[in-house]
Amino acid sequence: MLLRTAAASSLSLFNPNAEPSRSVPVLANNASRLVVRAAKGSTNHRALTGVIFEPFEEVKKELDLVPTVPQASLARQKYVDESEAAVNEQINVEYNVSYVYHALFAYFDRDNVALRGLAKFFKESSEEEREHAEKLMEYQNRRGGKVKLQSIVMPLSEFDHADKGDALHAMELALSLEKLTNEKLLHLHSVATKNGDVQLADFVESEFLGEQVESIKRISEYVAQLRRVGKGHGVWHFDQMLLHEGGHLA
């Protein structure tokens, strides 16, 4: 005997020719076991079978979004144009700062300046900023964006200052550049947050922001030390500290 649950919670004889008015389960007494099957037209198939994920059904929308033109990225997903542009801007920032630090390295490496510790510090700092730019380029490609390198401003070549001297003037410039870079990174993070891009936000937080704060703190201490020693013999001792103890930016 076959029974069907009615809408008013009453039981009636099963009519195989009748169309159910709503999705209802059907009880079938098959010899020694009770079988539950979906009634004709049932829309509650998942609840009856326990299936919560149907990959071949749900993937249809993603299949429609797969690019067919060779110029389009296959990896790109939930990566808006604003985020792509902001990453390219940050690449340009990192390269510009690297270029300035490289100019500072060349200045302090001159034979008539001969502050090898400061030269070493700024060379390592330049390499670090270039690595940051390359890391951003790799991320851009990973997300399916296009890297667009932009113009780099020609830096100064002379860094002596009549009142402060070259060492303090250069280190104050470095501190200002690190703070400016931090502002640019915070802007990139805000773009990611505004567009709900948690992957980009996490990338900026984990790879850049913490190190940037450490760099600002460290260079702030260098500025304070150089202000104490003035332009004289103390600069040579400071330079020797950088030369023998290291001190590149984070």
UniProtKB/Swiss-Prot annotation:
Fe cation 1 binds at E94, E129, H132. This is Ferritin-2, chloroplastic. Oligomer of 24 subunits. There are two types of subunits: L (light) chain and H (heavy) chain. The major chain can be light or heavy, depending on the species and tissue type. The functional molecule forms a roughly spherical shell with a diameter of 12 nm and contains a central cavity into which the insoluble mineral iron core is deposited. It is an enzyme of class 1 (oxidoreductase). GO terms for cellular component: chloroplast. It is found in: Plastid, Chloroplast. Fe cation 2 binds at E129, E178, Q212. One of its GO terms (molecular function) is ferrous iron binding. It comes from the Eukaryota. Belongs to the ferritin family. PANTHER family: FERRITIN. Its EC number is 1.16.3.1. The keyword Iron applies. The keyword Plastid applies. The lineage of its organism: Eukaryota, Viridiplantae, Streptophyta, Embryophyta, Tracheophyta. Residues 1-43 form a transit peptide. Residues 44-76 are annotated as: Extension peptide (EP). Stores iron in a soluble, non-toxic, readily available form. Important for iron homeostasis. Has ferroxidase activity. Iron is taken up in the ferrous form and deposited as ferric hydroxides after oxidation. Residues 77-230 form the Ferritin-like diiron domain.
